C-alpha cells in the first residue's frame, strides 16, 4: 500500500486567515495514487479550541462553522492540536514516506502557514512542493473561462468534503484543460 508516488491531500478549517491570531479547528487528509484514485481517507478531526476563541471569529466564519455543525464538534472535542497532528502522521506513514508527497489541495499555501505555526512536525512530513489546484483554476479563469461552468464544487467548508471537491476539480482540469484522457483505476 505504501508508494512514494502517492499524493497526500489535506484541508484545514480555521477560525480565520491569520496564523498569528487564528487556530485550526478541523483537519482531514486523503491519500490518492498518482492518478487521483482515492486510496484512503484519514481521520477527520475536530480540534478542541476554547469557546472564547470561537466567539471571536468574524461574521463569515461564525455563520459558516455554526451552520455546518463544526463549532459544536470543536466544543465537544477533546483532541488537541498536538494529538491531531500525531494521529494524522500515523495515518500518513502507512501510505507515503516523509518528505515524498507535495502538499495537495486548494489554496494550500494557507494551510501550510497554519501547519508551520501549530503542527510543525506534520508540516515537515510533506515535500516542500505544492500541488495546488487553485493554480490551475487561475489559469483556466484567464485562458479558458468557459470551462469553469463544468466545475462542480459543494463548498461545504468541511475539511473532508473540501478535499474531495479539490480532487474532483483536478480530475476535471486534467480532462478538459490539460486534455489528458480519463485514467482508469488499475486495481
UniProtKB/Swiss-Prot annotation:
<dbReference type="GO" id="GO:0006259">
    <property type="term" value="P:DNA metabolic process"/>
</dbReference>
<dbReference type="GO" id="GO:0000175">
    <property type="term" value="F:3'-5'-RNA exonuclease activity"/>
</dbReference>
<keyword id="KW-0540">Nuclease</keyword>
<keyword id="KW-0269">Exonuclease</keyword>
<feature type="active site">
    <location>
        <position position="128"/>
    </location>
</feature>
<keyword id="KW-0963">Cytoplasm</keyword>
<dbReference type="InterPro" id="IPR036397">
    <property type="entry name" value="RNaseH_sf"/>
</dbReference>
<comment type="similarity">
    <text>Belongs to the oligoribonuclease family.</text>
</comment>
<protein>
    <recommendedName>
        <fullName>Oligoribonuclease</fullName>
        <ecNumber>3.1.15.-</ecNumber>
    </recommendedName>
</protein>
<dbReference type="Pfam" id="PF00929">
    <property type="entry name" value="RNase_T"/>
</dbReference>
<dbReference type="InterPro" id="IPR013520">
    <property type="entry name" value="Exonuclease_RNaseT/DNA_pol3"/>
</dbReference>
<dbReference type="InterPro" id="IPR022894">
    <property type="entry name" value="Oligoribonuclease"/>
</dbReference>
<dbReference type="InterPro" id="IPR012337">
    <property type="entry name" value="RNaseH-like_sf"/>
</dbReference>
<dbReference type="GO" id="GO:0003676">
    <property type="term" value="F:nucleic acid binding"/>
</dbReference>
<keyword id="KW-0378">Hydrolase</keyword>
<feature type="domain" description="Exonuclease">
    <location>
        <begin position="7"/>
        <end position="170"/>
    </location>
</feature>
<comment type="function">
    <text>3'-to-5' exoribonuclease specific for small oligoribonucleotides.</text>
</comment>
<dbReference type="GO" id="GO:0005737">
    <property type="term" value="C:cytoplasm"/>
</dbReference>
Amino acid at each position: 500500500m505504501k508508494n512514494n508516488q502517492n499524493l497526500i491531500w489535506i484541508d484545514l478549517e480555521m477560525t480565520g486567515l491569520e496564523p498569528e491570531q487564528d487556530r485550526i479547528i478541523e483537519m482531514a487528509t486523503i491519500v490518492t495514487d498518482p492518478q487521483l484514485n482515492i486510496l484512503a481517507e484519514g481521520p477527520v478531526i475536530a480540534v478542541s479550541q476554547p469557546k472564547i476563541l470561537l466567539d471571536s471569529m468574524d461574521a463569515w466564519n461564525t455563520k459558516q462553522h455554526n451552520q455546518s455543525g463544526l463549532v459544536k464538534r470543536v466544543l465537544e472535542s477533546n483532541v488537541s492540536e498536538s494529538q491531531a497532528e500525531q494521529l494524522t502522521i500515523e495515518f500518513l506513514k502507512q501510505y507515503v514516506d516523509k518528505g515524498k508527497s507535495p502538499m495537495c489541495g486548494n489554496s494550500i499555501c494557507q494551510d501550510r502557514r497554519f501547519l508551520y505555526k501549530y503542527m510543525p512536525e506534520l508540516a515537515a512530513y510533506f515535500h516542500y512542493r505544492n500541488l495546488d489546484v487553485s493554480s490551475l483554476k487561475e489559469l483556466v479563469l484567464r485562458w479558458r473561462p468557459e470551462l469553469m461552468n463544468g466545475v462542480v464544487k459543494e463548498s461545504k467548508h468541511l475539511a473532508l468534503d473540501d478535499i474531495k471537491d479539490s480532487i474532483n476539480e483536478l480530475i476535471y482540469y486534467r480532462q478538459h484543460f490539460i486534455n489528458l484522457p480519463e485514467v482508469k483505476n488499475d486495481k
